[in-house]
Amino acid sequence: MTRVLVVGDIGQPVYHVGDEAMTISTAEYLADAGMQVILATRDTDQSKRYLGAGGSSAYEYMPFLLFPWAPAEREITLERLEEFLVSGVMPNLPDFCPSAQQIRDFVEGIQSVDAVVISGGGNLNSRYGWLLYERAAIALVAQYAKIPVFVSGQSIGPVLSPRDEEVLLRMLRSATSVAVRERSSYEWCREHDLKALAGVDDASDYRAHTPEITLDYADARVEVPELPERYVCVTVHEVSGSKVHELAALLDKIYSEYGLAAVFLGHMGDPASEGGRTGDYKAHELITASMTSPAAVIPILHADATVRIHQGAALNITDRYHPAVFSLSAGIPAVALVPDAFTEMRICGVMGHYGMQNFMTPLHMLGTDIPEKLIASALSLSRGQRQELRVRHEAVTALLHAWREYLAASVRGERQAHMPEGISVAAAVPALEPSLEAINSAVRELLLKTSLAEGNEWALSDRMHSWEAHMRGEFERAEDELQALKRSRMVRAAHRTSRQVQAMRHIGSRFR
């Protein structure tokens, strides 16, 4: 049986719905195709509980080689790994590196598979640089072992330090095939002479098999509450200050005008802490405290239950990526409140696949007329426009399935495997009158530029300070070793002098 390693961001203490969903979707397809799937995870026991195996056999699991967060330390860790791969001799490892045994086990684990699939995500950037390097490490071992690597459903950047970009480019160029999930990532690949598929998110066809499945809560089992007959699903995490009250007022207005009660649904949270009432839940609590209309706040749930709730809504409002994926895949409109360039790039990508890229505005536009008008437009989509959402979803899933068929055929070594054509461009659905659309486009562009500039400045500064701290630590260690050496020499000299004095006294005593 063909053994394939699927790499996703799973097994985290803080459960992330989108990361789990992308990995599950990819793993299920490959298992159904008759392959033995090995899942890279941070927590084997957790992943065994949360992920059910498809196909004819259970999943196997392999621990990640965990990288430090600091840029200097992760760069050095990757260099030490390659030194071992080149020479077969384990180099001296700083304290921040994984142990020699962990590195050996990691290398042997990858060498035991027939192919590697780096499943979708938004980890290929400096913002989450340690996750980028963990994937680069897997690809590096595979490259030395001549094991094919396939990169699926990724977002590239937008923030990359020059060194991180070098690491990323080497990883992508070593891959057999690359698929990205938005047009901006595809253009980045073209600019860097990388052949890539203009693809879609790996969870675009996510199937919620067991909505009753629960997470490991610290105190008691958390049940999905009874939901209103008609509701707006809200997932936000970047809201603070006056924006809390402005979003609360907007949701109150949605209830009074459309009869849609707010259901707050988190996408990140630690189920073992406060019964899952962490992460997004905290932001949701703040908003409901300022509302006068009915609202339900739900702790973090398993991906299966989460998807069902998104797809039962009349509308989804979000500042996160995967709520838009799950909403639009069911033909339900979404309105995005964008906090930064990182989110703008990703959500614009998935919204663009459905022609809904105009239904976005910066988060700081809360308190203006634009969010309210976007919501009104989303809720008043014509029957034909809603039908077009379903047609576009068919195109999205058709491409994803064609990509996976190519992936499976390539993993099996079938020479006739051909990469599909990229996703077609959808006609944009109008969301605002022209004057407001011009304003909204301008503020979105301004947010993108300023946030991207801030992000790039942060990445460079973070790397510089990291290397300064590392070199300072190296200097201090060298200084300590020098002082210890000096002390040891002084001690040895003192011992020699003492022995000489004792010898002279002994000789002198003979002549008394």
Residue ranges and their predicted role:
Residues S466-R512:
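Helical coiled-coil/dimerization "stalks"
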Residues M1-H465:
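Active-site anion-handling motifs in enzyme catalytic cores
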